[in-house]
């Protein structure tokens, strides 16, 4: 069946989001993953997070009395080039589509900060203490910014606005709300398998979006892009009568005896006697077990103690054991014992 190509792959049963001292940094831990999937998913999510999430940024600035970026402003300690570099670091959040125009006006002495900008609509300054420039006594400055929405990084030469205004200076725009993304892949255990993947993804944002939502958006982008490659109809699921699917015995009987952490001697004796599941074991009597080659009282007592902890004992009668589809049932109920 073609659906086994994806249905029989192990799926993560643990997704944990962790916060750090810095509220803009968070981590997501996903496990277990098939071998190699940690690298595959980690790299794909990282690239999408850094390149494809939308945000807001300043695209151009007009400063009264300034014709180009190589000018200086009387009474302002920074030259225009430094001011533009500071403007590029202003972090914004805006749900509405741009462009929007905002203004800041201030007289010296004092510091012009991002929080001094008169925002419009739902626009929010995320780093209001960020310094734009410093004014001396008697100095005055008025700046008008164009704020737009987009994704990725747009250089200043692509932000040129041909509206006839003199002195409108384009600015490099980093729209992405994601600042840094890193990931690491470690081994993790699931049942008796020790080499599944554990993925830890660490995301640093500018505050416009939290890490959990950012990962969700990136995963949705990947899902939308990859769906184009699925060229077949989803196979119809086989309808199973609920009455037939209900077990008539304890699901713990579907657990394999090699998961009981028995001594090597006891485990080998059970293996040699073709005892695979606990359901096979509990139907054996004590006398039958003692007739097993190399199986003695010490092994018998060990097994009786382990079964007692599970509410089971030797010599039990299970009329419906073994079920016909025992392997499928064991997989279905493995998380219940």
Swiss-Prot record:
InterPro entries: DNA-dir_RNA_pol_insert, DNA-dir_RNA_pol_RpoA/D/Rpb3, DNA-dir_RpoA, RBP11-like, RNAP_asu_C, RNApol_insert_sf. It holds the Pfam family RNA_pol_A_CTD. SMART domains: RPOLD. Coiled coil: none annotated. One of its GO terms (molecular function) is protein dimerization activity. It catalyses: RNA(n) + a ribonucleoside 5'-triphosphate = RNA(n+1) + diphosphate. This is DNA-directed RNA polymerase subunit alpha. It comes from Bartonella quintana (strain Toulouse).
